[in-house]
Amino acid sequence: MLNTSTSGGSGVHVVLASSSSASVNGLKNYYIAKIQEKEIVLRDKIENLRRLQAQRNELNGRVRSLKEELQQLQEPGSHVGEVVKVMGKKKVLIKISQEGKYIVDIDKSIELKDLTPGVRVALRNDSYALHKILPNKIDPLVSLMKVEKVPDATYEMVGGLDEQIKEIKEVIELPIKHPELFESLGIAQPKGVIMYGPPGTGKTLLARAVAHHTDCTFIRVSGSELVQKYIGEGSKMVRELFVMAREHAPSIIFMDEIDSIGSTRTEGGKGGGDSEVQRTMLELLNQLDGFESTQNIKIIMATNRIDILDPALLRPGRIDRKIEFPNPNELARLDILKIHSRRMNLTRGINLRKIASMLGGASGAEIKATCTEAGMFALRERRVHVTQEDLEMAVAKVMKRGDESNMSFKKLFK
């Protein structure tokens, strides 16, 4: 009996020990889970705090900017003037429209080297002290005229105009790239050139090629864009056009269809519209006289009717060279054909010289249209190559002429 009771007591001790160790493990796991739960909550709180701090910083920045804007709005207005001449280290001559000219003080924050003639500035309302330099005021329509991307045209894309390329290089490209040559000779740089001739002879293409090779800011404007509805708007656009050209020098101003504003003036005018056009042309003449040839601003004009232009616009000193663009001769037509057909899939035995002889009196644009039409004839017959007959039919279609014995002409118009 004693032995039995003794063994039973040891069993009870074993059960109690195992149950106590299980409870300890359970408490340990419980607190580990609680700690992990609190760590997750803590991480969420930290992320939320960081997000709130970022929002606080953003709102503080907005408050500061609004305070600065409010302070600027509460400041008294300033007079707007234009720098005429720097009179010393602390004085400058300013022109204010409707009021006249004043010699004013310069604020300490203004650099004297930035005060060049023509710069717009702000003057304090009470003391007339110069305290801010303003950007030049340019019409958005004028800003759109500037070609940001350099044109991709090159001299190799211009065919049959070797003499014209040489002349425009001397007037436009050489002064921009090598002004020291003109200084060593003691002669003034040319200001501009006018290109005239029938439509489609390559005037615009050559102007784009010049801008490509000189790496200049290319500002293209049509003369009709300067004809505005209201009085003074056209003259204002001309002034701002030259202001933008000075800011982005070296620059080339290409004025196409100049005859729309540069026609010969008549006595007394024919009406309000003609008077406004004449005022625009007078402003153009004033701007051509107002800039020096050394300012790296060159003018290229183009027209189909040089006979109706005003002599004042064409005089030397404003336009220094007149370049004629006639319709190409047979050799030039052959060069243009080779340029436009170099990427075409032509069959063997194509006689381009014969096509050039058939295009008598055609312009460069008509020759290009001939190559395009020849390709269209090939597409119409579901071919991937252009034949001699396609080119001859294209000539007949573009030039609208042919004889009854020409089989390709009969095939086109049957």
Swiss-Prot record:
Keywords annotated in UniProt: ATP-binding, Cytoplasm, Nucleotide-binding, Nucleus, Proteasome
Location(s), subcellular: Cytoplasm; Nucleus
Broad class of where this protein is predominantly found: cytoplasm
SMART domains referenced in this protein's UniProt entry, alphabetically: AAA
Annotated ATP binding sites: 197-204
Listed SUPFAM superfamilies: P-loop containing nucleoside triphosphate hydrolases (SSF52540)
CDD domains, alphabetized: RecA-like_PAN_like
Domain of life the protein comes from: Eukaryota
Signal sequence segment: none
Gene Ontology molecular function terms on file: ATP binding; ATP hydrolysis activity
Gene Ontology CC entries for this record: cytoplasm; nucleus; proteasome complex
Similarity comment: family membership: Belongs to the AAA ATPase family.
Function description: The 26S proteasome is involved in the ATP-dependent degradation of ubiquitinated proteins. The regulatory (or ATPase) complex confers ATP dependency and substrate specificity to the 26S complex.
Protein name: 26S proteasome regulatory subunit 8 homolog
Organism this protein belongs to: Naegleria fowleri
